Amino acid sequence: MKLVFLSHVSDCAGGAQRCLLDLLRGLKHIHPDWQLYMVLPGPGDLLDACSPYIDGYRFLQMEWWLVGKDMDIGTREKLSYIRKLSKYSIKLTRYLRRIKPDYGMTNTVVFPHLAISCKMLGIKHCWFIHEIPDVTWLNLNPVFEFRFIFRAIDKLSNKILVTSRYAEFHYQKVMTSAKISSITQAVELPMTVGVDVKCDRHTRYTILLVGAFDSNKGQMELLQAVKRICLL
C-alpha cells in the first residue's frame, strides 16, 4: 500500500501537524511494509519529525483558498487563484504519477491541490479536516464562497474525517453525511508513569486545559467524558 499526505505548513507546532505525525508513526508501526509519502510547502521541523516514517517527500508551494480579512476578493483574484491552482495541481500530478499512491490524504481544509490531482488520476482521496473556517476562523475570508468550498471537498473525497462530534454535526449539514466520521482521539498522549493505581478516589478533580480553544477541538467532549468517568 502506498499513501501520500499533504500538509499545509512545514512546522510541527499545530494540532493538525501533530495528528499527521502520530498517524504516520502509527501506520508505519502497524504496517511497516507500507510506503508513506508527504507533500509540504518546504523544509522544517515537521519533515524532520516525520522523516523516520516516510519513504519520500516533495516540496510544493500552494496558495490557500482562505485569505486575510483585509484582502479584496473580486473576479480578478478568483481567476488568478484558479490559474495558480491549476498550475500547481498539475505539478503535483506529475509527482503522483511517479510514486503511484493508492490513496491520498489532505491534512487541512485550506487548499484542494492533492484532492484535485487525485481526482485527475483516479486515486482515492480522504480529507482530514481540523478546522471549521466559517465558524472558528473569523479572521480569514474564503476566495470562493464557503458553500462552494464545502461542495468541492464533498465531491473530491471518498472519505472525510473530522476531529470532534461538533465538527461532524456541522459538516453533515453541508456534505454527504455517510462520508463523514469523527476521530475523537487523534493526538497521542504520553504514558503516565509512577501513578499509584490503588490510591483512594477523590471527591473533586481539577483539570487544566492549555491551548487554543474553540468548539471544533473537542474540549467540551473531553470534559463530558471525564464527568462520565467520575460517575462510574
What are these regions (language model features)?
Residues 14-25, 205, 212-228:
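A conserved mid-protein helix/loop that constitutes part of the nucleotide-sugar donor-binding site
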Residues 8-10, 109, 185, 209-215:
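Conserved donor-binding loops in enzymes that form glycosidic bonds
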Residues 7-14, 26, 30-79, 167-170:
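N-terminal strand-loop element at the rim of the active site
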Residues 166, 186:
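Carbohydrate-associated surface elements
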Residues 86-88, 124, 133-156, 189:
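Nucleotide-sugar donor phosphate/pyrophosphate-binding loop at the beta->alpha transition
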Residues 104, 154-165:
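A short beta-strand/loop micro-motif in the catalytic core of glycosyltransferases
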Residues 85, 89, 103-123:
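An aromatic- and histidine-rich active-site surface loop
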Residues 1-2, 193-206, 230-232:
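Nucleotide-sugar donor-binding and catalytic loop/hinge architecture
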